[in-house]
């Protein structure tokens, strides 16, 4: 660079370039991830699943956790108001019966509904709650092994996880559930917007709402790339905690939001 070309000046603390990380470690794995992007645009991927949006919330173990469900529910309601073509499925774990097994508390019916929804397909899955590298929530609402075994080919969602370390990709000695969700070559996700470290509830709320607004371009039909939506969200979020949120996937990819092309030409065979 020329002298002083890399000097940081001014007070701008935002992001200039939309970034996406395609996490691969070999040419064969890179080819598999590129192939998923091609399949995402293939005619075989067309279907009503692209109108679906699924929310999945952790249960309320304390008063703070209760706000996770309320906030995620409100997010979904605003989305359907802004974009009426979106069909929202709400999976709130506290709406299900909790069972206690030898390994701890579980929500088998909520988990089944979530896995079934993944197989049927949705454009976006949005989870808000606790999590670690191995699973979502202490009730194991979604586990690493399940991410590896998904078979939802041609129905790849964007997986949004506002949690802790479910997609902590900077430890080469420990692969996470989020990474396996992305690496699944015939299932899993087309990309993830995910946290790599713990995120505060307040920042999580703010980013989740802004992200959905940016992804679905409220008030417009000019939809941005997923990476650009996250860039706009990060700029609009004041907290430094926003830095733990990353986009895993093709930075040039847009959500496959259906474009209505119905043209009325005749009524009862009369032009």
Question: What would you call each of these model-derived segments?
Answer:
Residues 1-271:
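Cysteine-dependent hydrolase recognition
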């Amino acid at each position: 660079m020329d002298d002083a070309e890399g000097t940081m000046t001014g007070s701008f603390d935002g992001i200039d370039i939309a970034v996406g990380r395609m996490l691969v470690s070999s040419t064969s794995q890179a080819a598999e991830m590129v192939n998923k992007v091609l399949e995402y645009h293939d005619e075989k991927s067309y279907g009503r699943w692209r109108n679906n949006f699924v929310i999945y919330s952790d249960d309320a173990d304390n008063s703070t956790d209760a706000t996770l469900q309320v906030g995620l529910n409100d997010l979904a309601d605003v989305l359907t108001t802004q974009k009426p073509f979106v069909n929202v499925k709400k999976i709130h774990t506290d709406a299900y019966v909790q069972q206690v097994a030898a390994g701890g508390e579980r929500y088998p019916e909520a988990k089944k509904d979530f896995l079934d929804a993944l197989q049927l397909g949705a454009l976006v899955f949005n989870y808000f709650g606790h999590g670690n590298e191995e699973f979502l929530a202490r009730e194991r609402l979604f586990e690493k092994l399940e991410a590896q075994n998904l078979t939802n080919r041609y129905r790849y969602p964007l997986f949004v996880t506002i949690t802790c370390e479910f997609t902590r990709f900077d430890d080469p000695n420990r692969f996470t559930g989020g990474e396996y969700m992305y690496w699944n070559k015939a299932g899993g996700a087309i990309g993830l917007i995910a946290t790599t470290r713990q995120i505060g509830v307040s920042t999580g709320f703010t980013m989740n709402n802004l992200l959905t607004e940016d992804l679905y371009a409220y008030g417009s039909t000019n939809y941005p790339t997923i990476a650009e939506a996250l860039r706009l969200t990060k700029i609009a979020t004041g907290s430094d905690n926003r830095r733990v949120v990353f986009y895993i996937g093709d930075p040039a990819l847009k959500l496959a939001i259906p474009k209505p092309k119905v043209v009325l030409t005749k009524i009862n065979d009369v032009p």
